[in-house]
Amino acid sequence: MLIQNDRRMQRILSGLAVAVAILVPVLALASGGGEHHPDSGAQLKDFGWRVVDFALLAGIMIWALKKANVKGSLAERQLQIEKNLREAREARETAEAKLKEYTEKLEKANQEVDTLRAAMLKEAEAEKQRIVAEAQAAAAKVTEQAAQAADQEVLKARTELRVEAARLAVELAGGKLGAAVQKADHDRFVQDYLGKVVQL
């Protein structure tokens, strides 16, 4: 439809150009008034050549315009601009989609980092509690071992003191009873006393 309108417009413009080419010289001649026309044949010949010149000039211009294909060039340019606009719109939409996608990925990565940070803090706190518990258990064990070692040392010291006390008691008793008691009584007393000390 656009092409038909263009052709009709070309025909109308061509017709107007021919009409103007004929009417302008006629009007120019008519405006000359009623003066004496010494050689009207020469004027008509001159007018004819002018019309032919104008027609040739108009034909050359129309041919040049068609050859230049101004409408086609403009239509192609319009199509190219529309294509460029469409491609730019598609590129913008693609860029916006990628921006949205990368924004979502960045937000997801930030959430994952926050989750990992929270998990690491929780794990670090659990590790801290475990280390503290192990340290407390080790301290309790060392305290218990020290208490047992102290108890053993106390028992050992008591035993040594008892043995020493028994020895001294035997010597003292032996010195006092040595004069009053016979050798057989003496051995019996020592054996009885040693038996009691061993039972303690």
UniProtKB/Swiss-Prot annotation:
Provide the topology term for how it sits in the membrane. Answer: Single-pass membrane protein
Task: Write out the function statement from the record.
Answer: F(1)F(0) ATP synthase produces ATP from ADP in the presence of a proton or sodium gradient. F-type ATPases consist of two structural domains, F(1) containing the extramembraneous catalytic core and F(0) containing the membrane proton channel, linked together by a central stalk and a peripheral stalk. During catalysis, ATP synthesis in the catalytic domain of F(1) is coupled via a rotary mechanism of the central stalk subunits to proton translocation.
Q: Which cysteines are joined by disulfide bonds?
A: none
Its gene is: atpF
Question: Oligomeric state and partners?
Answer: F-type ATPases have 2 components, F(1) - the catalytic core - and F(0) - the membrane proton channel. F(1) has five subunits: alpha(3), beta(3), gamma(1), delta(1), epsilon(1). F(0) has three main subunits: a(1), b(2) and c(10-14). The alpha and beta chains form an alternating ring which encloses part of the gamma chain. F(1) is attached to F(0) by a central stalk formed by the gamma and epsilon chains, while a peripheral stalk is formed by the delta and b chains.
Which is an annotated GO molecular function term of this record?
proton-transporting ATP synthase activity, rotational mechanism
Keywords, in A-Z order:
ATP synthesis, Cell inner membrane, Cell membrane, CF(0), Hydrogen ion transport, Ion transport, Membrane, Transmembrane, Transmembrane helix, Transport
Q: What is this protein called?
A: ATP synthase subunit b
Task: Show the GO cellular component annotation of the record.
Answer: plasma membrane; proton-transporting ATP synthase complex
